[in-house]
Swiss-Prot record:
Contains 5 disulfide bonds. Its main location: secreted. This is U14-lycotoxin-Ls1b. It is found in: Secreted. Expressed by the venom gland. It comes from Lycosa singoriensis. Has antibacterial activity. Residues 21-66 form the WAP domain. One of its GO terms (cellular component) is extracellular region.
Length: 87
């Protein structure tokens, strides 16, 4: 009986961890003119209020976490500078 209770509690704990995963929201814009690309952040630590630094077509921007996957967090190891990006 104890092993059944343990398994149920373990599954409950694991599902809570999986459901609490946070993501970058889906970007609003799907395209961007090159002259409008700017990075407001290069890593999560550049953002305030526990926001994520998310990659979007017009650059990197801080966003509140979303429960649904759809966006992409910026790779903190990638070469990045804040400000306008000139190609």
């Amino acid at each position: 009986m104890n092993s059944k209770v343990f398994v149920v509690l373990l599954l409950l704990a694991l599902s809570t961890c999986v459901l609490s995963e946070k993501y970058c929201p889906t970007p609003r814009n799907t395209s961007c003119k090159k002259m409008n690309i700017r990075n407001n952040c290069c890593r999560d630590s550049d953002c305030t209020s526990n926001a994520f630094c998310c990659a979007e077509p017009c650059g990197n921007f801080c966003h509140k976490a979303s429960d649904k996957p759809g966006g992409r967090r910026v790779d903190p190891n990638a070469s990045c500078k804040t400000g306008y990006v000139y190609w």
